[in-house]
C-alpha cells in the first residue's frame, strides 16, 4: 500500500492557502479565529 501523503505545494496552496480560505464563509471564520489567537502565520501560503 502506498503512503497517503504525497506532497505537492500547488495542491497544498489550493486547499489550505489564503485565497482558498477567503473564498468561503467557513474559511473566513478560520482566518478570524487565527487572527483572534494572534497567529503569526494565518495560512500555509504566507509562511
From Swiss-Prot:
One of its GO terms (molecular function) is structural constituent of ribosome. Transmembrane segments: none annotated. Residues 31-41 have a biased composition (Basic residues). Keywords: Ribonucleoprotein, Ribosomal protein. It comes from the Bacteria. One of its GO terms (cellular component) is ribonucleoprotein complex. The keyword Ribosomal protein applies. InterPro entries: Ribosomal_bL34, Ribosomal_bL34_CS. Residues 24-47 are annotated as: Disordered. GO terms for biological process: translation. Belongs to the bacterial ribosomal protein bL34 family. PANTHER family: LARGE RIBOSOMAL SUBUNIT PROTEIN BL34M, MITOCHONDRIAL RIBOSOMAL PROTEIN 34 FAMILY MEMBER. HAMAP family: Ribosomal_bL34. This is Large ribosomal subunit protein bL34. The lineage of its organism: Bacteria, Pseudomonadati, Pseudomonadota, Gammaproteobacteria, Candidatus Palibaumannia.
Amino acid at each position: 500500500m502506498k503512503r497517503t501523503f504525497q506532497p505537492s505545494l500547488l495542491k497544498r496552496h489550493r486547499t489550505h492557502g489564503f485565497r482558498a480560505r477567503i473564498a468561503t464563509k467557513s474559511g473566513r471564520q478560520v482566518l478570524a479565529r487565527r487572527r483572534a489567537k494572534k497567529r503569526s502565520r494565518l495560512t500555509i501560503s504566507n509562511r
